[in-house]
């Protein structure tokens, strides 16, 4: 598959070259906190599929950073360009995510993406790829481990253990809700390891997922709509 997308400039569509590109882009990931101490806007992104997988559906939710209430929601649809290949999720989903980002009326200060950050065999999951391409601070929130190993965290909400790969930490296993499997939390770009954990904890409510990706997941999976309060919708939509 050939692509003219500038996000994948020079990529010939092969798996081998995609992995090489990941290794190159991973060197551009920044693991220092660039998020304001008092951010105004957060965003959550998730991806689903329609038409038996032929259409990629990316959901974006913009939230107030203090109240975690949704301010606006958008869904972008693009033709699915490649099949699922383990470890190459961003090459399949990033075009739709960037389309959804462009629909937001304001730029978020911090982005949460359903998927891996640097907790990835080549340190470039979809949240890291998104962050490098956009320059936005990003955190990856994944439901399952893709790389590394960890000791099972304790049973209580907030219990966490480091995820290690080759002796280096690549993320956290976080018990976000009792009696639920831990989340895989990792920095994507312009967020530190500790910052990724702290921000995830700050955005948890009564659910397993933090609010930004929980709301985006509802839209992307078509399990429900996200209601924007009237006072907010008049301001931003």
Swiss-Prot record:
GO molecular function: deoxyribonuclease V activity; magnesium ion binding; RNA endonuclease activity, producing 5'-phosphomonoesters; single-stranded RNA binding
Cofactor(s) this protein cannot do without: Mg(2+)
One of the Pfam families matching this protein, by short name: Endonuclease_5
Coiled-coil features, chain-numbered ranges: none
Record's function text: DNA repair enzyme involved in the repair of deaminated bases. Selectively cleaves double-stranded DNA at the second phosphodiester bond 3' to a deoxyinosine leaving behind the intact lesion on the nicked DNA.
Family according to the record: Belongs to the endonuclease V family.
Organism annotation: Xanthomonas euvesicatoria pv. vesicatoria (strain 85-10) (Xanthomonas campestris pv. vesicatoria)
Listed GO CC annotations: cytoplasm
Lineage: Bacteria, Pseudomonadati, Pseudomonadota, Gammaproteobacteria, Lysobacterales
Protein name: Endonuclease V
């Amino acid at each position: 598959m050939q692509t003219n997308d500038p996000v994948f400039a020079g990529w010939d569509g092969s798996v081998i070259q995609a992995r090489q590109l990941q290794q190159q882009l991973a060197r551009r990931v920044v693991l220092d906190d660039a998020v304001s101490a008092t951010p105004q806007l957060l965003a959550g992104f998730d991806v689903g599929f329609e038409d038996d997988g032929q259409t990629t559906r990316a959901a974006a939710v913009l939230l107030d950073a203090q109240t975690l209430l949704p301010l606006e929601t958008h869904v972008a649809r693009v033709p699915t360009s490649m099949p699922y290949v383990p470890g190459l999720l961003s090459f399949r989903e990033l075009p739709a995510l960037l389309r959804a980002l462009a629909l937001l009326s304001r730029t978020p200060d911090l982005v949460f993406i359903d998927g891996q950050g640097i907790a990835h065999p080549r340190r470039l999951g979809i949240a890291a790829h998104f962050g490098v391409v956009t320059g936005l601070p990003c955190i990856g929130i994944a439901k399952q481990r893709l790389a590394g190993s960890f000791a099972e965290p304790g049973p209580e909400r907030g219990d966490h253990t480091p995820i290690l790969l080759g002796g280096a930490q690549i993320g956290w296993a976080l018990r976000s809700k009792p009696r639920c499997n831990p989340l895989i939390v990792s920095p994507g770009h312009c967020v530190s390891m500790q910052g990724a954990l702290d921000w995830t904890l700050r955005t948890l409510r009564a659910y397993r997922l933090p609010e930004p990706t929980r709301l985006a997941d509802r839209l992307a999976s078509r399990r429900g709509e996200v209601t924007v309060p009237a006072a907010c919708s008049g301001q931003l939509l």
